[in-house]
Design a protein with these regions (language model features):
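EF-hand and EF-hand-like helix-loop-helix modules
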Residues: 49, 64-73, 90-92, 102-128, ...
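EF-hand Ca2+-binding helix-loop-helix modules
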Residues: 1-125
Length: 217
């Protein structure tokens, strides 16, 4: 699965750096974290993430863990389904979705990164890969993004998220016929709903005391 036998040498770093945007130094740091999580093994399984204290109380803990084993997040063309274990390459690619964008990017590059992060967020909640997420899942996304801004308390963020969910429900279902079934929020709708959110700097997680907000050039 692309696992690396030892600390990646420079030629391997080049490919990984180009694919993920991480610097050689950052890749080295993440490789050490990978080895710690895998008990110095070559692959990671879902159970290896159960030892991470910062994930234990996260309300979307299961979705975060599952995201590491979702082929859609490996930046491979038309990849679907899940895997039982991942190597360092896959781990690094998924981690790059949580990496804040470089301040040196132009507007077009920033938009590409924003869309990648939105797709990653959507995939995280679209667990059955049917192209839609539920209103409740959308509420979770909004609450998480607001909570991570640091400007709002947890209860305030929850209240705003509840209101956002109800607003989407009223708009979506208000245009439906009585016999129609609400199929959920598509990615296109999801993108429009979150257009006012600055998700680029709010998607971060901690792994064994390593904050991904520090992993920017």
């Amino acid at each position: 699965m692309g696992a690396l036998n030892s600390l990646p040498d420079e030629p391997q770093y080049v490919g990984l750096a180009e694919k993920t945007g991480f610097s050689f130094e950052q890749i080295g740091i993440l490789h050490k974290r990978f080895k710690q999580l895998s008990n110095n093994g070559e692959t990671l399984r879902r159970e290896d993430f159960n030892t991470i204290p910062d994930l234990l109380c996260n309300p979307i803990r299961s979705q975060i863990i599952e995201a590491f084993f979702d082929r859609r997040n490996f930046r491979q063309t038309d990849a679907v389904g899940t895997v039982h274990e991942i190597g360092f390459g896959e781990f690094l690619v998924v981690m790059s979705h949580f990496r804040p964008p470089s301040i040196r990017l132009d507007d077009e590059q920033k938009e590409v990164i924003r869309m990648e992060k939105l797709r990653f967020l959507f995939n995280m909640h679209d667990t059955d890969n049917d192209g839609t997420i539920t209103l409740e899942e959308y509420r979770h996304v909004v609450e998480e993004l607001l909570s991570r801004s640091g400007a709002l308390g947890k209860e305030t963020a929850k209240g705003i998220a509840d209101a956002a969910m109800l607003e989407v429900a009223s708009i979506s279902m208000g245009h439906m016929e009585p016999d129609e079934f609400y199929e959920g929020i598509t990615f296109e709708h999801f993108n429009k709903l979150l257009k006012e959110f600055e998700i680029e700097s709010r998607m971060n997680i901690r792994f064994m005391n390593m904050d991904t907000t520090t992993l920017c050039k």
